[in-house]
Amino acid sequence: MENLREQKGKIIAQTRAIKKLDDGFAVQSQNSKRFYFVDNNGACNCPDCQINGTTTCKHMFAVKYFLGIQKADGTTEKIRLTYGQAWHAYNQAQTSEVKQFEALLSDLLETIEEPERQGAGRPSLSLREQVFCSVKKVYSQMSSRRAKGLFDEAKEKALIKKSPYFNCVSALLNKEETTELLERLISLSAMPLKSVETQFAVDSSGFRTTRFSEYCRDKHGAEKKHEYLKAHILCGTKTNVICSAKITEGDGADSPQLSPLVQNTNESGFNVVELSADKAYNSINNFNTIREAGGFPYIPYRKGTAQTCRSGNRGKFWRRMYHYFQANQEEFSEHYHKRSNVETTFFMIKSKLGDCLKSKNFTAQKNELLCKLLAHNIIVLISEIYELGIAPQFAPFQEKEVVKSLHEN
């Protein structure tokens, strides 16, 4: 079904003047002789885009339709409208990723203030070095023993003072206290992009803890099922950076995780203007949480939902949004489509860092998955260094009790 802007765009393409320029198109207004400029990247200078923040206005639709019906020599030729890729920035980010990854990870971990060592004896490996080796190992997707060579290289580069034994990673990931540390590091790693991200999306996805081959099933007739952990994330829709994350068992519910994710993101200093999520997150509590954070929820309602079934003051905002959803479905859809970016984020993680966890128990698997999410954020930062020209500066790690408990255990 075409929305109103698309319908008007087709009318403009058929009845008004559209001129091809070197760097875009001049599109005549539907109601006046004024022209608006749509550049080759798909941005328009009309009030609908500049004031209302519309992502695809009627002038952009007019250009797309114009290119589709343009007749140069009496025949109809379809011309594909494409958007340029910043290949130079992309190539720089990809070719320098490994080197930049180590440097950014080291800078992030420098924000952890460790307590002074007490007593005599051989000094233990610092928490910074343990986390560095753990994230580096997960990023490489190597086994613990094979990753020992990576630790040796990091010592030669002076990124760590001591190359630890291969099982130091397993020891750290098996600690329950490591979970809170990694969750906070994920939030800190996203904060350099808080001036960029104001629109967010939330969802969950499963990561396998086991691997079964088709050969085993075909030969022995054994029916085996994969076991999963579920990652719940809230990410920015522009850069795909993860602002907050929680890990649950595979059958963990989605809806209860939205409130802590939004609260953590808001406390990290992000300006939550809007948040998109699917129907699984539609609840009074979630709507109120997003509103209290200053955001606007774009969460569709299930079929058969009756606004009269939600009474009381707590459901007032939920009912108001229900009426908005029913009366403005075209406008709602224009914002809701940004939710697909969270699926893109999961694809980025699984395609680059894998969708299978190597650890054997739930605590270690949970922390290994958090290391994947942290590694993803660092990769995003590397990309934005070249795309947006940012210079990441990390806020200090404030949770001293977490650091203390890890040192004691």
Descriptions of predicted regions:
Residues 120-125, 142, 152-170:
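Short, basic interhelical loop/turn and adjoining N-cap
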Residues 279-280, 284-348:
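Helix-centered, glycine/charged polyanion-binding patches within enzymatic domains
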Residues 61-64, 330-409:
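Basic, amphipathic alpha-helical segments enriched in Lys/Arg and hydrophobic/aromatic residues
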Residues 118, 122, 131-132, 139, ...:
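Polybasic low-complexity intrinsically disordered regions
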Residues 140-153, 343:
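Short, charged amphipathic recognition helices of the HTH superfamily
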Residues 1-101:
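Long, low-complexity, compositionally biased intrinsically disordered regions
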Residues 83-86, 119-122, 304-316, 392-403:
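Arg/Lys-rich, glycine/proline-spaced intrinsically disordered segments
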Residues 86-139, 158:
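Basic, short loop/linker segments at the boundary and entry of helix-turn-helix/winged-helix-like folds
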